[in-house]
Curated annotation (Swiss-Prot):
Summary of the function given for this chain in its UniProt record: Involved in both the arginine and lysine biosynthetic pathways. Phosphorylates the LysW-bound precursors glutamate (for arginine biosynthesis), respectively alpha-aminoadipate (for lysine biosynthesis).
Amino-acid positions noted as binding substrate in the UniProt annotation, renumbered to this chain: 35-36, 62, 162
Protein name listed in UniProt: Putative [LysW]-aminoadipate/[LysW]-glutamate kinase
Native source species: Pyrobaculum arsenaticum (strain DSM 13514 / JCM 11321 / PZ6)
Family: Belongs to the acetylglutamate kinase family. LysZ subfamily.
Length: 261
């Protein structure tokens, strides 16, 4: 089994190459997608200003109040059904889901989160409608049909919750006992010193999170990759805008993170 995460940067630029490559893997894959840029577009049309939280360690996340959650659900619903419809045109039976559907992804709402304000001070703020994943029902994600999963979960109280897409992809990979987790974005892999790093161990990936050369979403990807690699899941960070991007990743392209070299 493999898990393919289609990052928001790919979704908002051109997801066609990934989608065209998916039929080859339809009987042994689960797809997870993002789409933050479309969320921002929907929010703008609703007159809502996107807000972000910076956490200790430098990780950044979207602040999700109720109005933001509504925009998030709308955007992710569109992306999800766009992917499913595109796969249908290629002869692939696909089922688009959020984590709330069939209760496939459960999460606990983060009531409070620790953030760093603009003055560099740490403080605790309301967590909004953001969840920490507690359970993935792997049996419901097994193909056929090919499952396409949006990064939304459901709480025990029936709340829809925004969950991090990379974290969701990792939890799905762990749940379905995947051999490989392919994280597709708009870069060729992890760049250090201006060059793509072809291979890393889990330990090396963890150490690089603290590097000033690793920023933004790549920090989170490396943290998830290190955790997955320790469980024996090979993680590949690769370019989803390339020709046959899944083939390319599985055949040595991008940055490969494993437990040991």
């Amino acid at each position: 089994m493999i898990v393919v995460k289609i990052g928001g940067s790919v979704i908002c630029k051109d997801a066609s190459r990934v989608i065209q490559n998916l039929p080859k893997y339809a009987d042994k894959a689960v797809v997870v997608h993002g789409g933050g840029c479309l969320v921002n577009e929907v929010m703008k049309k609703m007159g809502i200003e996107p807000k972000y939280l910076t956490h200790p360690g430098g990780l950044v996340s979207r602040y999700t109040d109720l109005e933001t959650l509504k925009a998030f659900v709308m955007a992710m619903g569109w992306i999800n059904k766009y992917i499913v419809a595109s796969l249908h045109a290629l002869g692939v039976e696909a089922l688009g889901l959020t984590g709330a559907d069939l209760g496939v992804v459960k999460a606990k709402r983060k009531e409070r989160v620790l953030v760093v304000d603009e003055r560099g001070r740490q403080r605790v703020v309301d967590g909004g409608y953001v969840g920490r994943i507690t359970e993935v029902d792997a049996a419901k994600l097994a193909p056929p049909p090919l499952k396409v999963l949006a990064p939304l979960a459901v709480s025990e109280r029936g709340e829809l919750l925004n969950v991090d897409g990379d974290q969701l992809a990792f939890d799905v990979a762990r749940g379905v006992k995947a051999d490989k987790l392919v994280l597709l974005s708009d870069v060729d892999g992890l760049y250090i010193g201006g060059k793509v790093v072809p291979r890393l161990t889990a330990e090396e990936a963890e150490a690089l999170v603290k590097s000033e050369e690793v920023r933004g979403g790549m920090k989170r990807k490396l943290l998830m990759a290190a955790e997955a690699a320790k469980l024996g899941i090979e993680v590949i960070i690769s370019n989803g805008l390339a020709d046959l991007p899944i083939d390319s990743a599985l055949n040595g392209g991008g940055t490969h993170i494993t437990k040991n070299l």
